[in-house]
Amino acid sequence: TTVKTANSGITFANGVIAAGQNLTIDSTGGPVSINSVMGSGTATSLTVNADSTDGGDNADTTETISIGAIGTANEIGAVTLDAADGITFTGDITLADAAGADLDIDGKVFISGNVTIDTDNTTGGGTDDGTINFSSTIDGVTEDPAVADNLVIHAGGAGGGSLTLSGNIGDGVALSSLKINATAGNLAFTVPQIGGGDAVGVTGNVDIGNAASGAITFSGTGTNALDVGGVLTVTGNGGATAFQFTGTNVEIRGDGGIAFVNGSGTDD
């Protein structure tokens, strides 16, 4: 099923889209707003494109997506979101236990409210973990009245699972809290710069990794390499290479405290 306009907005303001087959929503340059999308099968894919051209048009500022909850349990397979001017998440994203159930996010991301992104199925007894790919930055949203912008990421490392975080976190608007594989998952992954402009990237606590996590690499550089307003807790099980820093002149700040724990154990 395809819903398409020519550089005009598309809005599904209320209710839930029940996708019984692959769904493509393409505004070709207009803003897209979707309340929620659920599905009926592990192979059901969702593609939302707001770009007028491949990679976006610099002269067009309306290439945006705002989307709420996507999937629960085994309802939605692959999800691809393209919006050069920003993708705002307002709900949880849960992808199916199925090969190819990957999340591909092409555009800067804004977190509004509580958002959990989950492609870790093997922890719960499944067989396929999907990939999560952020192509750009991740920021909170300035709202009136203020809303806590909390991001939780569960990325599994089995069955082809992986996590890619390509841009700075909280460089524009800080998140309220951040958790990356804090409760489960044995994945090795890289964390980019958290913070920017001598300001924290997360105002509250940041929990990265767990006692089964593989090597965790931090790629940030300088005074905002890892800048947190609350407690920073990093846990891994990578042995001598559990925590690695690839940037230069790295400064780590946790106003509420800092803990790096090289743990051990299974994926729990």
Write out the residue ranges for each language-model feature.
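Extracellular lectin-like interaction modules
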Residues: 1-268
